[in-house]
UniProtKB/Swiss-Prot annotation:
Its cofactor is FAD; heme b. InterPro entries: Fe3_Rdtase_TM_dom (IPR013130), STEAP_metalloreductase (IPR051267). It comes from Sus scrofa (Pig). GO terms for cellular component: endosome; endosome membrane; plasma membrane. GO terms for molecular function: heme binding; metal ion binding. The gene is STEAP1. Keywords: Cell membrane, Endosome, FAD, Flavoprotein, Heme, Iron, Membrane, Metal-binding, Transmembrane, Transmembrane helix. Disulfide bonds: none annotated. The chain crosses the membrane at residues 70-90, 118-138, 163-183, 217-237, 252-272, 290-310. Homotrimer. Residues 117-264 form the Ferric oxidoreductase domain. This is STEAP1 protein. FAD binds at Q139, R160, S236, Q253. Heme b binds at H174, H267.
Length: 338
């Protein structure tokens, strides 16, 4: 969802223009650089892209790709979801069945799935901002912004919006599944069992202070994170993004996006609370899901902090405004000649 328009040469002229005009400027600049009649072709594509099935010829319908920018994000989401589901199933269901013959298969529809959803959501959100970090490192290494990114990185950056929308989708599902917990019959039976055990132990109060604080904090952070993700999703709608200036759009998608990733990571860390040092959490010598979930977001956040250091930040901004490191460019040219 993060915009790549901040690496162009005319950034200072575009800050107060609507995003639709920015896209037109990009098209005009491409036409000037390549001296090719791209505008008629783009107009033709624009005219055919929005026809319905009654207006568009059948042969043209078959030639058009179906959601081309969604292929990579959906594949990644499917892979992460499948691996997380199998991993959680092994720990939550298979392990107790093998070791103590306890049948917890009823956990699969809600509890297991609800451990998969936040893992996929925060991973996809980290994948939105990881290519920006890699792009900054590549530009620092090359000393210029005019050298093309690798094809895989360029494709990744183009699909960041789709990664972000999928992250929001899984976050909404996670919230809905969490709200359904009290409606489950198994939860009601467990609640009765807990009350009976409290009576048997002659406990008048089952209040656990630190556990109450843990839940209050991580639920609050989860709500705020979901609200920010909703804002990011709304601003990615073309009709909304076209009404924003470049600076407004960049602030929402970049700054608030990183804030949502930070809050989501803290949400997962507080959910874990003191489970990090609990040996019982390491079933079959495997770490719990939340440990794996926060790894990639933590790496992205640390890299973002490092790139915000003044010595690196100033150089990145200079490169993105057109400055070139002559020493690195000369070394690259010499190595290419050899």
């Amino acid at each position: 969802m993060e915009s790549r328009q901040d690496i162009t040469n005319q950034e200072e002229l575009w800050k107060m223009k609507p995003r639709k005009n920015l896209e037109d400027d990009y098209l005009n600049e491409d036409s000037r650089e390549n001296s090719m009649p791209k505008r008629p072709m783009l107009v033709h594509l624009h005219q055919t892209a929005h026809f319905d099935e009654f207006d568009c010829p059948p042969e043209l319908q078959h030639k058009q790709e179906l959601f081309p920018k969604w292929h990579l994000p959906i594949k990644i989401a499917a892979i992460v979801s499948s691996l997380t589901f199998l991993y959680t199933l092994l720990r939550e269901v298979i392990h107790p069945f093998v070791t103590s013959h306890q049948q917890y298969f009823y956990k699969i529809p809600i509890l297991v799935i609800n451990k998969v959803l936040p893992m996929v959501s925060i991973t996809l959100l980290a994948l939105v901002y990881l290519p920006g970090v890699i792009a900054a490192i590549v530009q620092l290494h090359n000393g210029t912004k005019y050298k093309k990114f690798p094809h895989w990185l360029d494709r990744w950056m183009v699909t960041r919006k789709q990664f972000g929308l999928l992250s929001f989708f899984f976050a909404v599902l996670h919230a809905v599944y969490s709200l359904s917990y009290p409606m489950r019959r198994s939860y009601r039976y467990k609640l009765l069992n807990w009350a009976y055990q409290q009576v048997q132990q002659n406990k008048e109060d089952a209040w656990i202070e630190h556990d109450v604080w843990r839940m209050e904090i991580y639920v609050s952070l989860g709500i705020v994170t979901l609200a920010i993700l909703a804002l990011l999703a709304v601003t990615s709608i073309p009709s909304v993004s076209d009404s924003l200036t470049w600076r407004e759009f960049h602030y929402i998608q970049s700054t608030l996006g990183i804030v949502s990733l930070l809050l989501g990571t803290i949400h997962a860390l507080i959910f874990a609370w003191n489970k990090w040092v609990d040996i019982k959490q390491f079933i079959w010598y495997t770490p719990p899901t939340f440990m794996i979930a926060v790894f990639l977001p933590t790496v992205v956040l640390i890299c973002k902090v490092i790139l915000l250091l003044p010595c690196l930040r100033r150089k990145i901004l200079k490169i993105r405004h057109g400055w070139e490191d002559v020493t690195k460019i000369n070394k690259t040219e010499m190595s290419s000649q050899l």
